[in-house]
Curated annotation (Swiss-Prot):
Residues 1-171 are annotated as: NADH dehydrogenase I subunit C. NDH-1 shuttles electrons from NADH, via FMN and iron-sulfur (Fe-S) centers, to quinones in the respiratory chain. The immediate electron acceptor for the enzyme in this species is believed to be ubiquinone. Couples the redox reaction to proton translocation (for every two electrons transferred, four hydrogen ions are translocated across the cytoplasmic membrane), and thus conserves the redox energy in a proton gradient. This is NADH-quinone oxidoreductase subunit C/D. Its EC number is 7.1.1.-. In the N-terminal section; belongs to the complex I 30 kDa subunit family. PROSITE patterns: COMPLEX1_49K (PS00535). It holds the Pfam family Complex1_49kDa. GO terms for cellular component: NADH dehydrogenase complex; plasma membrane. Its main location: membrane. It is a peripheral membrane protein. It catalyses: a quinone + NADH + 5 H(+)(in) = a quinol + NAD(+) + 4 H(+)(out). Keywords: Cell inner membrane, Cell membrane, Membrane, Multifunctional enzyme, NAD, Quinone, Translocase, Transport, Ubiquinone. HAMAP family: NDH1_NuoCD_1, NDH1_NuoD.
């Protein structure tokens, strides 16, 4: 089946099966179709697409909601108070499909179809108050929180509500809320008549790699059950996006995944540029690719060292941090910052490459291959490391897709899925590189894949070094923000545009757009909704880490606590990426 036939065939099959319950196809600028369904077939349509259709859609990439109460530009869309959106991916078709449901605050659950919908529905309940007809606990906000933060009626800043006063009664209530009863979660306290030990692993344990708690039921050292508890790092990033200008939100993207640097900026800007109709110049595209691959290496070096450390090897992390500093020195010279560069712009990048950038990059490229060889001898060829990781924490491709796993965690199972190859963006189609794959889907393969990815990133950076085109680093487009400085100095129209964009903000045309990239942890996706104003009406941030943690309870039963620590390290997450 060709790509141009993949989606029309799926749409026709859906319409044939459900008829008038497929209410409308929304006209958008997206690269995939958007269908509105009737509530009566919401669950059945998802089951049909996942289990019954030829070349199915096994991956629920995202599930999110939009409060439509203040939205003005909704031509051709069914009336809705809160719209529920699901984003499905077919690997066989290499195609996406988005389904929408108009709700009055109630929606059918699809957790019985897509297992990973559980956390997404909990989030939609937490943020919007959606009722899915089943018991749904808050997931990001504390249980004592009043209201649903992503509703338009909910305040965005603390200054919009009375001063906070911590009374004795409130303190006691908050303290009680921190106690989690396994009975209320449906988790057993006994095994073969013996009482299990309930252990709080985190939220301040160094091996949780952030403020993350896992409630464990233990029989001796063996994990019987696990219940992840997230939200401690939640900062309301999606709410912040509604209060910032389109340009002003870029620095916040860096803090979604604070180890990813510009990688977190790119999907947001791809979405905004799609809405604006901006074509980014070739030089800016290649600069973006080069910097993204640098940050991919920076992240993987950190993972590599801490992965080894969590199974008892202390030396590698110190060597790898030293090499990370060499990379960060280059990034600092180019972007002006090490970890939070805010360097990409709507229509390009902030500035051109500095004088001498090529010598710095060439030095790094000459240095790193031998270092990676040394790390392979220290870690991957270590008998102790292999004994702790081979065959531990293994899962197959079907299980990975069931729980929304993407990136190295998916490719470690042997699944060749990398958006840089399959759906090239920002000029990735110009580069020659391989996609490293594993076989067993265990901790060792997840480590091996990331180690090999660093070598491929070096290949991409070397090609950027040898083929960097000349030309501008910002698009010549009225919505490029900020406009090219040279143009501002020559004509009054560009200067006026700069003044308006800097004071009021860029006016982005009404519509919806999605930016997808192959991030260092997996599929990173920004879905933005513009109502024709200077701020986003809705910004949905789909991060890979949120999906990856949900699979922990299915993987770790039967492990020892020590193996649990190794498995957590092999996921490679940061809690800001989970909690946003």
């Amino acid at each position: 089946m060709s790509l141009d036939q993949a989606i029309p065939e799926a749409l026709q099959a859906l319409r044939t099966r459900f008829g008038a319950a497929v209410r409308a196809e929304q006209a958008t600028g997206e690269a995939f179709p958007v269908l509105w369904l009737d509530a009566s077939v919401w669950e059945a349509a998802h089951r049909f697409l996942r289990e019954e259709i030829a070349a199915p859609f096994p991956l629920l990439a995202d599930l999110w909601a939009i409060d439509e109460s203040l939205r003005q530009h909704r031509t051709g869309q069914p009336a809705s108070r809160i719209t529920l959106c699901s984003h499905l991916v077919s690997l066989v078709r290499n195609a996406d499909l988005r389904l929408k449901l108009a709700t009055d605050g109630r929606a059918p659950s699809i957790a019985g179809v897509y297992a990973n919908a559980d956390w997404y529905e909990r989030e939609a309940h937490d943020m919007f108050g959606l009722d899915f007809g089943r018991e749904t606990r808050r997931i990001l906000m504390p249980p004592t929180w009043e209201g649903h933060p992503l509703l338009k009626t909910h305040y965005a800043r603390a200054t919009e509500k009375p001063p906070f006063v911590l009374t004795d009664r409130l303190f006691e209530a908050e303290e009680r809320a921190t106690i989690t009863d396994p009975d209320l979660l449906g988790l057993p306290k006994l095994r073969d008549g013996e009482e299990l030990m309930v252990l709080n692993f985190g939220p301040h344990h160094p091996s949780t790699h952030g403020v993350f708690r896992i409630l464990l039921g233990l029989d001796g050292e063996e994990v019987v059950w696990a219940w992840p508890d997230i939200g401690y790092h939640h900062r309301g990033a999606e709410k912040m996006a509604e209060r910032q200008t389109w340009h002003g939100f870029i620095p916040y993207c860096d803090r979604i995944d604070y180890l990813g640097g510009v990688i977190s900026e790119l999907p947001y800007l791809l979405a905004v540029e799609r809405l604006c109709g901006i074509a980014v110049p070739p030089r800016a595209q290649m600069i973006r690719v080069m910097l993204c691959e640098f940050y991919r290496i920076m992240n993987h070096l950190l993972f590599y060292g801490t992965m080894a450390q969590d199974v008892g090897a202390m030396s590698p992390v110190f060597y790898m941090f030293t090499d990370r500093e060499k990379g960060h020195e280059i990034l600092n010279a180019i972007t002006g910052a090490r970890m939070h560069p805010a360097f990409f712009r709507i229509g390009g990048v902030a500035m051109d490459l500095p004088t001498g950038w090529d010598a710095m990059v060439r030095g790094f490229l000459d240095w790193m291959p031998a270092r990676l060889d040394e790390y392979e001898r220290m870690v991957l060829r270590s008998e102790l490391f292999r004994a702790r990781t081979v065959g531990v924490g293994a899962y197959d491709t079907d299980m990975a897709l069931t729980w929304g796993t993407t990136g190295p965690g998916l490719r470690a199972t042997g699944c060749d899925w990398d958006l840089r190859k399959l759906r090239p963006y920002s000029g990735y189609e110009q580069f020659d590189f391989e996609v490293p794959l594993g076989q067993r889907g265990d901790i060792f393969d997840r480590t091996r894949v990331r180690a090999d990815e660093m070598r491929e990133s070096l290949k991409i950076i070397r090609q950027c070094l040898g083929n960097m085109p000349e030309g501008p680093v910002k698009a010549d487009h009225p919505l490029t923000t900020p406009p090219p400085r040279g143009a501002m100095q020559k004509d009054i129209e560009t200067l006026i545009a700069h003044f308006l964009q800097s004071s009021w903000g860029t006016v982005v045309p009404a519509g919806e757009a999605t930016g997808q990239i192959e991030g260092h942890r997996g599929l990173t996706q920004y879905s933005v909704v513009s109502d024709g104003g200077t701020q986003s009406y809705r910004t949905r941030i789909r991060t890979p880490s949120f999906a990856h943690l949900q699979m922990i309870p299915k993987i770790v039963p039967g492990m020892t606590v020590a193996d649990l620590v190794a498995h957590i390290a092999s996921i490679d997450f940061v809690m800001s990426d989970v909690d946003r």
